[in-house]
Amino acid sequence: MPYTLEDLKAHGLSPAEYQQIQQQLGRDPNPNELAMFGVMWSEHCCYKNSRPLLKNFPTTGERVVVGPGENAGVVDLGEGDWLAFKIESHNHPSAVEPFQGAATGVGGILRDIFTLGARPIALLNSLRFGPLTDPRNRRLMARVVEGIAHYGNCVGVPTVGGEVAVDPCYSGNPLVNVMALGLLETPAVVKSAARGVGNPVLYVGATTGRDGIRGASFASAELKEDAQQDRPAVQVGDPFLGKCLIEACLEAFATGAVVAAQDMGAAGITCSTAEMAAKGGVGIRFDLDRVPARESGMAAWEYLLSESQERMLLVVQKGREAEVMEIFHRWGLQASVAGEVIAEPLVEIWHQGSCVVQVPVRALAEDTPVYVRPVLPEPPAYVQAAWQWDPATLPPCDCQGIHLAQATLAWKEVLLQLLASPTLASKAWIYRQYDHQVQNNTVLWPGQGDAAVIRIRSQRFGVGEVPPLRASRKAIAATLDGNGRWVYLDPYEGAKAAVAEAARNLTCVGADPLAVTDNLNFGNPENPVVYWQLALACRGIGDACRALGTPVTGGNVSLYNETLTPQGSQAIYPTPVIGMVGLIPDLKCICGQGWQQEGDLIYLLGSQALTSLGGSEYLAVIHQQVTGRPAPVDLELEKRVQAACRHGIRQGWVRSAHDCSEGGLAVALAEACLSGGRGATLSLAPGSLRWDQALFGEGSSRILVSVDPAQRSAWEAYLEAQLAGQWQLLGEVGSPADPLLLRTAEEDPLLVVSLAAMQAAYHGAFSD
């Protein structure tokens, strides 16, 4: 073997994988070919550890136009409108260069959308950081937010929603997941399969440099404590060039001359040529000397592994290349004929007049390693210990508060502490840095509803024309949801809960949930405990998606989210993030989360009994414990609760709707007060529950709604038929001067807290 073990390790390959390469080639690979195998056989590109588990996901449905395998999923919204959507991660790059790591994460996911022929219309993000009391974490968070805002604002795509959570497990390894949505402009989806022997392959976009080299391999290994040395693996983005690329590509696609398109993301030219050829069952001959370079003296392997941003490969009809290139030149972009489609299924790379790579397409893109690892037959020790936890071990509590050893902590103080915790606190400081109204289609923006709502406007209009409003007044809703702590304590139920919460958030704004894109953020799959977490989480996602009728159209897997330190390896919580889109039939029937009118009746849909303190924010913040077992998800009840909420919204009975999730019922009530600027008076009976569980216990299948009192009879008759007693009337909405007043059924006070006090706590965690 001409390579040492250190050589293989540098490329992320094992000795066994090198033997596979030798067998497939019938020889040793040359250094350029080895570099290509290193990135194409990385977890980031070939999903060698997760691919068998992803087969558990449902991927087809009545509205699915494009499922997994293309640059993004596509669903049919009716009336000729198709929606493309996808989520991606940029975790490792954001850890070492947070501004560019986050910014290029936005640029990359936008390319996945417009590569299909869709105009990007919205962005969302899901972020995880370590405690903000650590200056490093706070700086990292600020730079990530700045990077997201920079690219999204400059490229002209609104950032309309997302989520942020804070936990010590993310200190060394933050998570930056970005989701994008787009509406198809082309009559058909632009696919990535190269076709037509002799058709030219065009390189378009920005020039190629040395930034981002081996970025895919970097994303497929644990972060080292001295991760700053990996900064060259982080790409550098240009949103203004990205905007030009969007317009040029959509204009080129409209000519009908483009046969296939693929963005140059992870693994750059290597991945684009191999995947386009593999999907088309053809080969590609490519000449690196025709690639516009921004640096001199680049070696072949540097061209092949560069992940310079804002670049695309196009296969165009022979004879029409000049027509397409003129479009890109007019937009100030590079465009050159750098290759051609060939019949023999090979990736053939030329450099300085010599053939430097000749590899079977299947070896790079299809016959990659797949590892089916054994799944632990029973939960690991940490989970079994957590499940033995009993709430009775907590200090006693009553209607006055929790009686800690040093003093009684009143429920008002508990609520204020929870509202001030970074995971629950207002994220206004973050989302105010994002332009969430550019394009003028955002109907519900951050802080107004449980999901973002975007108006659908025609995307098929000429330059300089104003897009017409649709007579049908349809809209799209989108959300991102995840709870790493729940998945850590129960991967199966925690993953189910993430899917259920995403659907519930869409329901709360009046949308029918349609489909899912998922981002699986986990640790090292070679660790049996991590693989068990991953396997059970995938099973939970699959089961929940089947039950709720939300097929998975694609997604992203981000493994090795661990930090290697002298003390060992620190892994993140297993954190699947669910991106879900929904359809609102009529914009007249949407709902925000805040109270609307004084005197409206407040109802809780769902069962208080299906809650738990296990894994709750209350347990973590007040008692500094991460233990217990999260509440199981009753998917049948979930469907009925969501159906009841949507029906109430569309009948005009329900005036506000808000999901009860992190922080439990009391926090949901406070959020509805703060969002609507009104107090409320309510009565609560704990039943057999402890008071802290009744107030702050967490679970699925619960929605808080306010209802027009004139519709009480019709609403309650419908609820009883639909939910059979699994609902309760809690109280009524007050005025802007009223506090949040919670009492027992016997009229004893539980908590009284003013809007001003709640606002002060809620808006204090994130600020300059």
From Swiss-Prot:
Positions that bind substrate: S89, H90, N91, H92, R111, Q235, E307, S308, Q309, S558
NCBIfam families: FGAM_synth_II, PRK01213.1
Keywords: ATP-binding, Cytoplasm, Ligase, Magnesium, Metal-binding, Nucleotide-binding, Purine biosynthesis
Quaternary context: Monomer. Part of the FGAM synthase complex composed of 1 PurL, 1 PurQ and 2 PurS subunits.
Principal location listed in the UniProt entry: cytoplasm
Alphabetical GO biological process terms: 'de novo' IMP biosynthetic process
Cellular localisation: Cytoplasm
GO molecular function: ATP binding; magnesium ion binding; phosphoribosylformylglycinamidine synthase activity
Family: Belongs to the FGAMS family.
E.C. number: 6.3.5.3
PANTHER family tied to this protein: PHOSPHORIBOSYLFORMYLGLYCINAMIDINE SYNTHASE SUBUNIT PURL
Residues annotated as the enzyme's active site: H44, H90 (proton acceptor)
Superkingdom in the source lineage: Bacteria
Binding-site positions, ATP: Y47, K86, D518, G555
Single GO cellular component term: cytoplasm
Annotated protein name in UniProt: Phosphoribosylformylglycinamidine synthase subunit PurL
Listed Pfam families: AIRS, AIRS_C, FGAR-AT_linker
Catalytic activity line of the entry: N(2)-formyl-N(1)-(5-phospho-beta-D-ribosyl)glycinamide + L-glutamine + ATP + H2O = 2-formamido-N(1)-(5-O-phospho-beta-D-ribosyl)acetamidine + L-glutamate + ADP + phosphate + H(+)
